[in-house]
Structures are given as C-alpha cells and as structure tokens.
Amino acid sequence: MATKILALLALLALFVSATNAFIIPQCSLAPSAIIPQFLRPVTSMGFEHLAVQAYRLQQALAASVLQQPINQLQQQSLAHLTIQTIATQQQQQFLPALSQLDVVNPVAYLQQQVLASNPLALANVAAYQQQQQLQQFLPALSQLAMVNPAAYLQQQQLLSSSPLVVGNAPTYLQQQLLQQIVPALTQLAVANPAAYLQQLLPFNQLTVSNSAAYLQQRQQLLNPLAVPNPLVTAFLQQQQLLPYSQFSLMNPALSWQQPIVGGAIF
C-alpha cells in the first residue's frame, strides 16, 4: 500500500513540473532565419545572444569601412580621367602650331618633342640649355679630333681641369674655337679687309647691342675714303700681329727670334 502511495505522489510531481516548465531558445547557436517569423523583431533581438549582436555590429562596420575606399578610388579615377581630358585638349590646341613648326624647321620641332620627355630639361632648364650649347660645338671638336688627335686630347684634358670649363663650358669651347679661327682670320684680313670685317660679325659686341651703330661703322670702314684712315690701318695691322702677341706671351725668348712682319709700322 505504501508503495502505491509513493508512486502516485511521483506521478503528481512530474505532472506539476511539466505544466510549469518553459523552453529557452538557444539563439546563440542558431541563425536569425530559424527564429519564427511570427515573433516581432524586438522580441527576436531580445532573445539573441550578446556575441551575436556584437558580430552583427562588426559586420555592419566592416561593410561601411569597405565602402569608403571604393568611393574614394572612384573619385580619384574620375579626377584622373578629367586631368587626362584637359591634357588631351591642350595638346590638340598646340598640334597645329607644332605641325607648322615641323614644316618650317624640323630640327626645332624635334627639339620641342625631346624637351617634354627629357628629365634634365624638366629638372634644370639651365643645365639643359648648357647641354644644348655644348652639342653645337661637338662637330668642331670632332673635326679637330680627325685632323689633330693630339690637340683634341689636350683640349679634353684641359676641359676637366680648367676652372673656366667647370664654371662655363660653352664660353671655354667658344674661346678655343676662336683661337683656332684667328690664323685664318689674320690671312683673310691681309687679303681682303672688307671680308674680314664681315667675318667678325658674330663676335662683335657692338653688333649684338646696337645693330644700327654697327652698320654705320661698317659703312664707314668699307667706304673707299675711310680705308686710307690711319686708325683703320693700325687696327688691321694689330689684328695681323695678334698671333705673334700671344706667342710672345707664352715664350718671350723665342718671340725675339721670329721675323718681324709688321715692319711697315716702324
């Protein structure tokens, strides 16, 4: 009898616990799609675990951060395309002028084309111009190397040691070329003074500063009445004696042994 009473009490206890029990959903392991659709969003968010909420916030922040660089890259690409369009329009504006320059002077056209792609010209315009001036003297130096290799090597040695070359290479090369041209100009002055004065045109400072005064001076010198002028005669004789003056400065002892050419002055 006692056994039956204990079994009945156990059944009553199980019945009471079954009626009062409730189920806690394990939302931390289940995605939000498994949550019943009839529950309100607030209810479903309330049942979510804190880890799930943090994960959702992290995903939202990551999406927003990833969208910002994409927008910036799109803006940069649009700015780059705009700059390319402006550069193309400017180039199209200069194309007619460059085409005319190509027809008139192909050498200048090629120089303009090289100027835009030369890093030296973009970095240092003065050094680029000096390089262009040096290239103008290269043919004369090449001819000197073919005619007299010893003199060419001597000039190359002086080119690396002379302070004038380091400071101003075009001036040094022009001075060297003038020293080579002086004997030919001296012979031309003896044979034809008018042609000699015409040859001095690129080296005359009066021509560069005042062309009108130079033309007036040239007309006076080429005038038959001005040729017998003793000043003109003395100037031509001084130009004729210029190589011997340089020789006397370099070696005075040997200069006395040279024959006197300008004896007419004495």
From Swiss-Prot:
Span of the signal peptide: 1-21
Pfam families on file: Zein
InterPro entries in the cross-refs: Seed_Storage_Prolamin (IPR051529), Zein (IPR002530)
MF-aspect GO terms: nutrient reservoir activity
Keyword tags: Seed storage protein, Signal, Storage protein
Miscellaneous remark of the record: The alpha zeins of 19 kDa and 22 kDa account for 70% of the total zein fraction. They are encoded by a large multigene family.
Record-stated family: Belongs to the zein family.
Function: Zeins are major seed storage proteins.
Name the UniProt record assigns to this protein: 22 kDa alpha-zein 8
Organism the protein comes from: Zea mays (Maize)
Protein encoded by which gene: AZS22-8
